[in-house]
Amino acid sequence: MVLLKEYRVILPVSVEEYQVGQLYSVAEASKNETGGGEGVEVLVNEPYEKDGEKGQYTHKIYHLQSKVPTFVRMLAPEGALNIHEKAWNAYPYCRTVITNEYMKEDFLIKIETWHKPDLGTLENVHKLEPEAWKHVEVIYIDIADRSQVLSKDYKAEEDPAKYKSIKTGRGPLGPNWKQELVNQKDCPYMCAYKLVTVKFKWWGLQNKVENFIHKQERRLFTNFHRQLFCWLDKWVDLTMDDIRRMEDETKRQLDEMRQKDPVKGMTADD
């Protein structure tokens, strides 16, 4: 049994802007999670072309340890707490597959994302079979709703309800910001439709871990997109060439931080 959920994240940015904003924010967020031998290691970041699809391919290793629950940490052997993330970014469509060498085909997280210029109103954008779609839970993430943020994750400087962009004039986002977007002719909007498939086959732990993973994915999507909006002025003027240069520099920094910095970022047992 696999657990499927679709997360919809509406943002006051355009689909074109988001391409740059997402890559900028991924690079920055990676640094916040790396240190003490843990965090992100970038193995490959290169263009790809396959079956008529063109985009950017990345292969990363996440060294987790403190970022997985204690009950898994106690059962898993040394080295089993690394996960491999392979992503094919053929924007505006992106597919990410996360695996683990120890668990092989018994563990999978697949994230398929369509970025669309709408307010999250499309149904079955990933074109699943009607019978499969019927069982998918749809979850709306509101980046301005503080009640969706864990208190330990909250940072005032990353709160869209308080942030105002100097360069674009967007923000702060009030309680009805999504309804107001429709009438704001000068403010673009989009929705990231993220279909997440989770498979974890381990007798006695399957449901517990699959639910834990979805909880963490929702937490990641919420925190990440709050940051992305509140970092708007840092990335809105950047080009894709700027981003590629920044990614090269980030890879070097991550390698250094993993060795020299203390453990930091989200942990599972908070």
UniProtKB/Swiss-Prot annotation:
Give the CC-aspect GO terms.
cytoplasm; nucleus
Kindly indicate whether the keyword Transcription regulation belongs to this entry: no
Annotated family: Belongs to the PtdIns transfer protein family. PI transfer class I subfamily.
Q: Which Gene3D superfamilies match?
A: 3.30.530.20
* Post-translational events: Phosphorylated by PKC in a calcium and phosphatidylserine-dependent manner.
The residues listed in the UniProt record as binding a 1,2-diacyl-sn-glycero-3-phospho-(1D-myo-inositol), with positions renumbered to this chain, are: 58, 60, 85, 89, 96, 194
Question: Organism source for this protein?
Answer: Bos taurus
Entry keyword annotation includes Methyltransferase: no
Its taxonomic placement starts with: Eukaryota, Metazoa, Chordata, Craniata, Vertebrata
The record ties this protein, via Pfam families, to: IP_trans
Keywords, A to Z, come to: Acetylation, Cytoplasm, Lipid transport, Lipid-binding, Nucleus, Transport
Q: Catalyzes what? A: a 1,2-diacyl-sn-glycero-3-phosphocholine(in) = a 1,2-diacyl-sn-glycero-3-phosphocholine(out); a 1,2-diacyl-sn-glycero-3-phospho-(1D-myo-inositol)(in) = a 1,2-diacyl-sn-glycero-3-phospho-(1D-myo-inositol)(out)
Q: Which positions bear N6-acetyllysine?
A: 215
User: Briefly, what is this protein's role?
Assistant: Catalyzes the transfer of phosphatidylinositol (PI) and phosphatidylcholine (PC) between membranes. Shows a preference for PI and PC containing shorter saturated or monosaturated acyl chains at the sn-1 and sn-2 positions. Preference order for PC is C16:1 > C16:0 > C18:1 > C18:0 > C20:4 and for PI is C16:1 > C16:0 > C18:1 > C18:0 > C20:4 > C20:3.
* MF (Gene Ontology): phosphatidylcholine binding; phosphatidylcholine transfer activity; phosphatidylcholine transporter activity; phosphatidylinositol binding; phosphatidylinositol transfer activity
UniProt name for this protein: Phosphatidylinositol transfer protein alpha isoform
Q: Where would you say this protein principally sits, based on its record? A: cytoplasm
Q: Which domain of life is it from?
A: Eukaryota
Q: Which InterPro entries match?
A: PI_transfer (IPR001666), PI_transfer_N (IPR055261), START-like_dom_sf (IPR023393)
Q: Where found?
A: Cytoplasm; Nucleus
